[in-house]
Amino acid sequence: MSKIGKRAILILLALPIGFNVMAQEIKKLTLEDLIPGGETYRYAENLYGLQWWGDVCIKPSTDTIYTVQPKTGKETVLTTLGQINKVLADNKAGKLPTPYSIRYPWADKPQMLLKISGKYIVYDFENNRIVSTLKLKDKAANEDYCVANGNVAYTVNNNLYVNEQAITDEPEGIVCGQSVHRNEFGINKGTFWSPKGNLLAFYRMDESMVTQYPLVDITARVGEVNNVRYPMAGMTSHQVKVGVYNPSTGKTIYLNAGNPTDRYFTNISWSPDEKSIYLIELNRDQNHAVLCQYDATTGKLLGKLLEETHTKYVEPQHPIVFLPWDSNKFIYQSQRDGYNHLYLCDLTSSLKGEWKSDAAGGKHIEYIPTKQLTEGKWLVGDILGFNAKRKEVIFQGVDGTGSNNFAVNVNTGKRSLPFSFRSTTEGEHNGMLSASGSYLIDRYSTPTLPRRIDIVDTKSLKTVNLLTAKDPYEGYEMPTIETGTIKADDGTTDLYYRLTKPTDFDPNKKYPVIVYVYGGPHAQLVTGGWLNGSRAWH
């Protein structure tokens, strides 16, 4: 037989085998593959517990904790779970199940913070010893550990404690040390330690005048009634005060905020010297916000720094943040131009203050010098931290296609390239900044990449890759996901959509459509991340 004939037979014999393998590889998804908790649930690889110890990256595994040098990616064993548990057992201090919950808040000390069975334990991983132990009362919740001095603020039921000392003794209907105002306006906690831990600000919410609404606890063996205080439309709402507790004297004062008592007190922060408390007060109609400064010792109002109004609404979301290198200047965030941006404020001088109109239709007045640092048709997300050496604020920026991390110089206003410039600027990027601001852990995904984790040098933008996850649906038959925009009724505003077509989609057929819309605030459903933000079961 000729060589050509032999080749033809070999190719023909190989084709059915190849087609058979391909047919076997293409699988159909089931609910078990798509629903969290399913026996075959498909999820992307991840690295849990990544964080910084100063400028050294901590990378835990199930039984070993590694350090990663951010310049080279070199990994070194820091300690093991077995070693930690041996010391804990020797001191009858309990057992740590995994290393993923360990914190490393002290950049200048070889110490870690453990939380085990209602106790906070400071552990020296260099000398393998327990430095201190603090036990909380039973039913402790809303815990707030002060890194500066090791004190812990927490609540038991509706009252506030510091360590084992009760700070408040209020009856049912008055709640202390918990988040207030239904967690709106950036509120997600109820206690605020001063920078050195000498004072503790906290919320006190009187809702005794609010009617109770019955909810059913379905987790009990037999359903139980759980009454919550919830003001129905037009009915009396709760009243909030801000207290300041001094652990050294045991005394508490309250800010003299005056009337009306049903307004919102949001975005609490401290001055670096602990002498002043700053907060943004919002009226009940939510259309007039005022940045106020109070004396932390007397509770007296020291002055108004900024005011903003709008005929529709004003929505403060972020507390002011002082520059680490200048205690007289802070960063303020505002949506006054239609997009959330950063503003640099200076306390060293004052202004007479005049109302000025804003591009977004509102008005503002400044009683201290204020300079806009960022601008454009995009949003500032969270401030991630600072690089004091380069005088930079490092933050997350968000636009219609995704998010990324940037730096802006407070002196010049110059903004950096996106930190992921050397890898991909596409997708959703979430950053965790090192202590000095020199490095950043960048977790991100794109519509076709489930997850990648890099360490980024915030100056050179060079990266060290820690993880590139494989597609968990590789080998499965997948639907087609399309994204785009349609115009709102005004004919101008773009509304982003995500369209998922079935795997056997026939363009010549007419299909029923399930339209899912949740138009709530801060509920972005279409993203530039993995599968454009679609959940597996969508």
Where are these regions (language model features)?
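Hydrophobic alpha-helix feature that most strongly marks membrane-spanning transmembrane helices
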Residues: L282, A296, H310, Q335, ...
